[in-house]
């Protein structure tokens, strides 16, 4: 509640514990901060948007839901948008678990197409090793972020291989081959002349 009594009146500051001992002598500053509200919370310390954002970040179920929604969008979109959705969902859930879920979902979606299964298996194995290392040993945050970045780069390469550059190169070459194999303008002119004689 915004209009909490403790937001503007600290009971413990005027509490007399007996024998002249005040509250500040009973509790350290860290102990007070652990159970007393932050100063300025009721006087505009957080506005509605900041409080909503703070609640979303602190609740794991909401973070998982947002990541799941963005993962579904990533599976059903093209390469660049899929990569953006993957990076956004990596803010809310661990990157290795996200990569494993994306690779499995993409393989189930494109089950008959087995051209890029090797990269997918490599990504899932690297993600599983990363999960094992982070759960069994103490890895620094910097090293873990570096592993996450490497996994995301490999995933970006995988997504571009499936959706992006291969199709963009193959489509113009087919059109060019069709144009080259078609009848020339001289052949069209000769065909018109032969029909005009009749």
Swiss-Prot record:
The 22 kDa precursor is probably cleaved by the I7 protease during virus maturation. Phosphorylated on tyrosine and threonine. Its phosphorylation state is regulated by the F10 kinase and the H1 phosphatase. Phosphorylation by F10 kinase seems to be required to form the membranes associated with IV. Keywords: Disulfide bond, Membrane, Phosphoprotein, Transmembrane, Transmembrane helix, Viral envelope protein, Virion. GO terms for cellular component: membrane; viral envelope; virion membrane. The record marks 18-19, 182-183 as: Cleavage. The keyword Membrane applies. The chain crosses the membrane at residues 56-76, 146-166. It is a multi-pass membrane protein. It is found in: Virion membrane. Pfam families: Pox_P21. Residues 1-55, 167-198 are virion surface. Residues 77-145 are intravirion. Its main location: virion. The modification Phosphotyrosine is found at residue 198. Envelope protein which participates in virus morphogenesis. Needed for an early step in viral crescent membrane formation by interacting with D13 scaffold protein. Its interaction with D13 scaffold protein leads to the formation of rigid, crescent-shaped membranes that assemble around the cytoplasmic virus factory. Membrane anchor for the protein A27. A17-A27 virus envelope protein might be involved in fusion or attachment, and can further associate to A26. Interacts (via N-terminus) with D13 scaffold; this interaction helps D13 to associate with membranes. Interacts with A14. Interacts with A27; this interaction allows A27 to be anchored in the mature virion (MV) membrane. Part of a complex composed of A17, A25, A26 and A27. Belongs to the chordopoxvirinae A17 family. This is Virion membrane protein A17 precursor homolog. It comes from Fowlpox virus (strain NVSL) (FPV). The lineage of its organism: Viruses, Varidnaviria, Bamfordvirae, Nucleocytoviricota, Pokkesviricetes.
């Amino acid at each position: 509640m915004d209009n909490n009594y403790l937001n503007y009146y600290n009971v413990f500051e005027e509490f007399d514990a007996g024998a002249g001992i005040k509250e500040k002598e009973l509790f350290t500053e860290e102990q007070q901060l652990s159970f007393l509200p932050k100063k300025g919370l009721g006087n505009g310390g957080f506005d509605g948007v900041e409080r909503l954002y703070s609640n979303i970040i602190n609740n794991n179920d909401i973070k998982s839901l947002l990541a799941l929604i963005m993962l579904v969008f990533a599976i059903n979109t093209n390469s660049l948008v899929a990569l953006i959705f993957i990076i956004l969902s990596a803010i809310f859930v661990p990157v290795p678990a996200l990569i494993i879920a994306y690779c499995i979902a993409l393989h189930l979606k494109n089950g008959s197409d087995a051209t890029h299964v090797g990269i997918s298996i490599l990504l899932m194995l690297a993600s599983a090793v990363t999960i094992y290392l982070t759960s069994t040993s103490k890895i620094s945050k910097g090293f873990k972020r570096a592993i996450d970045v490497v996994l995301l780069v490999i995933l970006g390469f995988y997504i571009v291989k499936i959706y992006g550059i291969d199709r963009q190169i193959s489509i113009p070459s087919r059109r060019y081959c069709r144009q080259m194999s078609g009848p020339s303008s001289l052949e069209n002119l000769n065909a018109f002349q032969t029909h005009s004689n009749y």
